[in-house]
Amino acid sequence: MAETADVIIIGAGVQGASLAFHLARRGVSVLVLERDAVAAGATGRSSGFVRMHYDLESEARLAWASFPYFRDWSDRVGAGDCGFVRTGFLQLVPHGLAEALRINTAMLQRLGVTTDVVGPSEVARLVPGAVVEDIGAAAYEPDSGYADPSGTAFGFLAAARRDGARLHQGCRVTAVAVAGDRVTGVRSDQGDFGAPIVVDVAGAWAGQLAATVGVEVPLEPWRHDTAYFGRPAGHGAAFPVVLDHAHEMYFRPEGDELILLGLESGNTVGGSPDRPMEALKQATIEEMVTRICARLPWMATGTLRTAHGGQDGLTPDQRPILEQVGPDGFYLACGFSGTGFKTAPAIGACLAELILDGRTTSEDISAYTLARFQAGRHLVGEHPYGNLWR
């Protein structure tokens, strides 16, 4: 007899884990099916930023609603450790985007976020040794920082399993099963599983699974590369997480010895999500060094420690799809486009409300529909920065 549940979640990254937690705590029978291992996909390669600065208010609200989970993990989740480190966060923009940043920061302040616009001199104080002449303005969030993405996913799942959720790793779902106009479960390489509700949280593979129920999702696999560099001696001082629009990169401290660095440009979009994750090309590493040294000249004597590539699903507007679509009981939660970690706690809560109550009450996710792409209504902030990490 096939194993059954009230809800099957396909994917055990941080989004699937958060949803499992929120459903299980409400007494729902949850089965999580993961093709590889917990956090083995985009989550395990995430840089773990915890920040609220977005140019789209609904996205900022999701990040703001998620923040208390990271800050108060033991009280809110009570299992595992998300590893949150409060470093502060800086959003750096060139002169041409300074006014947009001021308006977006005012929007965040209206939501209740502790954040201010600061100038180059304050950036130089917060990031010792930084070149600041090209900075038009910066937004500073003193309470933000970074967390451990894998630890966050494992913690959510530990809490979900404490409340009765089940997890199968190494279980590759091949199709969503449908009878008439209703979902009945899934087919996998470990057999069939039954449920009246299936949530596709399969990251870069989400589009393939949606296609098995006739739902076409504009989702492309997107590779993102990150590297850890050793800091030179004498440069172990703390500094904030930084999104640097001028140099199209981001970086953050890892303890007092390392810097994690990623680039926005030059990443591969398209192809098969099953392609092997090859090592970073030497040209990519050299470009990383060039850009970080342009902002932090003292990194010229830094040393590469390790580097890796990961992948996520990218939508045309680089924002997720969160809704019921296609046959009754089929839900999409995909297309996070590399920025889903920091919003995962609130999105899990919203999806649980949508599934169980038919509507969301904590935050409004009604704009995150699949139909927006067909209608040409891409989600874009009123004052966008015009690049991937927004």
Question: Where are the regions that the model predicts?
Answer:
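Short beta-strand to alpha-helix junction loop
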Residues: 61, 91-100, 140-158, 277-284
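Helical element adjacent to the flavin cofactor pocket in flavoenzyme catalytic cores
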Residues: 140-194
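Active-site lid/adjacent beta-loop-alpha segment flanking the redox-cofactor pocket in flavoenzymes
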Residues: 216, 231-329
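C-terminal catalytic lobe of FAD-dependent flavoproteins
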Residues: 290-390
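Beta1/beta-strand and adjacent pyrophosphate-binding region of the FAD-binding site
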Residues: 2-13, 31
